[in-house]
Amino acid sequence: MPVWGGGNKCGACGRTVYHAEEVQCDGRSFHRCCFLCMVCRKNLDSTTVAIHDEEIYCKSCYGKKYGPKGYGYGQGAGTLNMDRGERLGIKPESVQPHRPTTNPNTSKFAQKYGGAEKCSRCGDSVYAAEKIIGAGKPWHKNCFRCAKCGKSLESTTLTEKEGEIYCKGCYAKNFGPKGFGYGQGAGALVHAQ
């Protein structure tokens, strides 16, 4: 802990980690949102983390990268090599050259993944204390609202279309079925004599 207050520095992004969002591993501190596998970016915990040269991995990625290799050491069909079709004239995708970062943050993790995730609505950084996951994406608590009416949403009350989130009512009005027989209940029926 630093002498003059504040908190420990995150082992991934290098920023200050406060107690409410701290995860400790191998004598280092991490933000909960930074405690991710270096390869697949899955969230980690004390039962799924594996460490190699101060980098953190899930056990699956660690095994693939640093585990024993050779006949008899496969981990099921997921480790089989795939024919890429070169003999059929299919060209493999070109690999992009590595570009050095201009980010002053020297953390390998932050350089590789750009630090904090971005909010799907406003595009600003989302930190663990204010992050909500909805439709598989990060959102600020204040941005986690219906795109049409602005009503605050919960993960159980949202519907998603083309990357935007809506309350069930607005989704039904704007994207639901239309035409005869799709009124709003018995009040939409008209009886003519």
Swiss-Prot record:
The modification N6-succinyllysine is found at K137. Residues 10-61, 119-170 form the LIM zinc-binding domain. A motif (Nuclear localization signal) lies at residues 64-69. One of its GO terms (cellular component) is Z disc. InterPro entries: Znf_LIM. GO terms for molecular function: actinin binding; metal ion binding; structural constituent of muscle. It is found in: Nucleus. Keywords: Acetylation, Developmental protein, Differentiation, Isopeptide bond, LIM domain, Metal-binding, Nucleus, Repeat, Ubl conjugation, Zinc. GO terms for biological process: cell differentiation; muscle tissue development; sarcomere organization. The modification N6-acetyllysine is found at K112, K131, K137, K161. There is a cross-link at K91 (Glycyl lysine isopeptide (Lys-Gly) (interchain with G-Cter in SUMO2)). CDD domains: LIM1_CRP2, LIM2_CRP2. Highly expressed in the aorta, but not in heart and skeletal muscle. Drastically down-regulated in response to PDGF-BB or cell injury, that promote smooth muscle cell proliferation and dedifferentiation. Seems to play a role in the development of the embryonic vascular system. Interacts with KAT14. The LIM domain 1 is necessary and sufficient for this interaction. Interacts with GLRX3. PANTHER family: CYSTEINE AND GLYCINE-RICH PROTEIN 2, RHO-GTPASE-ACTIVATING PROTEIN LRG1. This is Cysteine and glycine-rich protein 2. It comes from Homo sapiens. The lineage of its organism: Eukaryota, Metazoa, Chordata, Craniata, Vertebrata. The gene is CSRP2.
